[in-house]
Curated annotation (Swiss-Prot):
Job description of the protein: Plays an essential role in the viral genome replication. Participates, together with NSP2, in the formation of viral factories (viroplasms), which are large inclusions in the host cytoplasm where replication intermediates are assembled and viral RNA replication takes place. Orchestrates the recruitment of viroplasmic proteins such as capsid proteins to these factories. Participates in the selective exclusion of host proteins from stress granules (SG) and P bodies (PB). Also participates in the sequestration of these remodeled organelles in viral factories.
Localization per record: Host cytoplasm
GO biological process: viral genome replication
Lineage: Viruses, Riboviria, Orthornavirae, Duplornaviricota, Resentoviricetes
Biological source species: Rotavirus A (isolate RVA/Human/Belgium/B4106/2000/G3P11[14])
UniProt protein name: Non-structural protein 5
């Protein structure tokens, strides 16, 4: 028996995740683990103006506000600075004192994932082929009920009756007795018909 499996045209699996998730990778060049804390400022115009005036225009990014209306709701990261070309973010409040590109500085890399789509396409087919041998069918017949094979010229006392038509023969309780007598009667008629035709 041979079995071959080949899967065909299964529907493609696609899933979309629309979330704004940020994952931070911490680099420990100086042996210290760096984390970034969030500082939430009260939503009033005075605090917002003070914060915006303390930063240069190129340092202000989307992370400075949590909504489209900064006066209503906005969040401030305590050490927010612009990202350098080497994808490192300096943890210092001043970028001029210690640039993030120097070796030995603590750096944190942020990666933002939005609208992630996962597509998995599986093209295959299923085919099953079986080869059944005769040996198996023979075994199935052996498992069934078996009857003894009777030869035409058998001398066994279990199956052959004597020549007399009496019920007191050797095979008085034989289950083939009726069939045997019916067959013998037909054979006699055939023999008599052949003699008459000759």
């Amino acid at each position: 028996m041979s079995l071959s499996i080949d899967v065909t045209s299964l529907p493609s699996i696609s899933s979309s995740i629309f979330k704004n998730e940020s994952s931070s990778t911490t680099s420990t060049l100086s042996g210290k683990s760096i984390g970034r804390n969030e500082l939430y400022v009260s939503p009033d115009a005075e605090a917002f103006n003070k914060y915006m005036l303390s930063k240069s225009p190129e340092d202000i990014g989307p992370s400075d506000s949590a909504s489209n209306d900064p006066l209503t709701s906005f969040s401030i990261r305590s050490h927010a600075v612009k990202t350098n070309a080497d994808a490192g973010v300096s943890m210092d409040s001043s970028t001029q004192s210690r640039p993030s590109s120097n070796v030995g500085c603590d750096q944190v890399d942020f990666s933002f994932n939005k609208a992630v789509k996962v597509n998995a396409n599986l093209d295959s087919s299923i085919s099953i082929s079986t080869d059944q041998k005769r040996e198996k069918s023979k075994k199935d017949h052996k498992n069934g009920k078996h009857y003894p094979k009777i030869e035409a010229e058998s001398d066994s006392d279990d199956y052959v009756l004597d020549d007399s038509d009496s019920d007191d023969g050797k095979c008085k309780n034989c289950k083939y007795k009726r069939k045997y007598f019916a067959l013998r009667m037909r054979m006699k008629h055939v023999a008599m018909q052949l003699i008459e035709d000759l």
